[in-house]
Design a protein with these regions (language model features):
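A short, glycine-/small-residue-rich helix N-cap motif at loop->alpha-helix starts
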Residues: 2-11, 33, 119-120
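Short aromatic/hydrophobic "clamp" motif used to bind/position activated sugar donors
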Residues: 13, 25
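Short acidic donor-binding/metal-coordinating loop in glycosyltransferase active sites
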Residues: 16, 22, 30-32
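Active-site acidic short loop of glycosyltransferases
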Residues: 20-23, 36, 48-49, 111
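Conserved nucleotide-sugar donor-binding
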Residues: 21-23, 95-110
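Acidic donor-binding/catalytic loop of UDP-sugar-dependent glycosyltransferases
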Residues: 29-45
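Catalytic donor/gating beta->alpha subdomain of glycosyltransferases that bind UDP-sugars
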Residues: 47, 53-77, 104-107, 111-176
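Alpha-helical bilayer-embedded segments of polytopic membrane proteins, i.e.
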Residues: 168-196
Length: 196
């Protein structure tokens, strides 16, 4: 009966990881592309013998319109949170639009075993479970960036946000709680400025 709820995306990722010829795996998504031809070198260049995870950033370009500005702002805040947290030795998530980890690490943590029944979480929940301050590195250089295609419909963006929110309650540690508190305080600050 549990097989009914198995995420096809996670199954596809698992089969891909199993079939991979080399230990270092690098991921992006179909709606993203590297900004230049040095992306592979930049991301893989972050590995040392101790490194098992490399986190990168995927930008959302400066498209015209309020909706695109909102998405770009949200994407920037999310990136700042997870990358700065990892840089301060508290990694808690990654983003599948620009992410690398070792095949060995994937199987050491039994892949997506902890979240097979969830449709989302192939990137954030796995990194949340497997990352440590010792095994995680951030690469943020012009060569390491990817870029997401423009999102044209509110429903698509909302689905992405709901999907991410559905996995947040499974995060270990209290890093995400801190960032939720920070977001709430920022919202209250803006509301108080507007009210004055």
């Amino acid at each position: 009966s549990d097989a009914r709820y198995l995420s096809r995306r996670k199954l596809a990722f698992t089969l891909g990881v199993k079939a991979a010829k080399y230990d270092i795996l690098l991921f992006t998504e179909a709606n993203c592309q590297p900004l230049n031809d040095q992306w592979l070198s930049a991301m893989v260049g972050g590995y040392t013998p101790e490194t098992s995870i490399v986190l990168g950033y995927c930008k959302y370009s400066n498209y015209k319109g309020f909706f695109h500005k909102l998405i770009a702002y949200d994407n920037l805040l999310t990136g700042l949170r997870y990358l700065s947290s990892a840089l301060s030795h508290h990694p808690y998530i990654g983003n599948g639009r620009n992410l690398s980890y070792r095949k060995e690490l994937f199987f050491k943590h039994k892949g997506y075993c902890q979240s097979l029944n969830l449709h989302a979480g192939d990137d954030d929940l796995f990194i949340n479970e497997a990352s440590t301050k010792e095994n995680t590195k951030v690469i943020y250089t012009p060569d390491s960036l990817t870029e997401m295609d423009p999102i044209e419909r509110f429903g698509v963006w909302k689905e992405m946000k709901v999907s991410r929110a559905a996995t947040q309650r499974y995060y270990k540690g209290n890093t995400s709680t801190f960032y939720h508190l920070e977001s709430t305080c920022f919202f209250l600050f803006q509301a108080s400025v507007i009210a004055m």
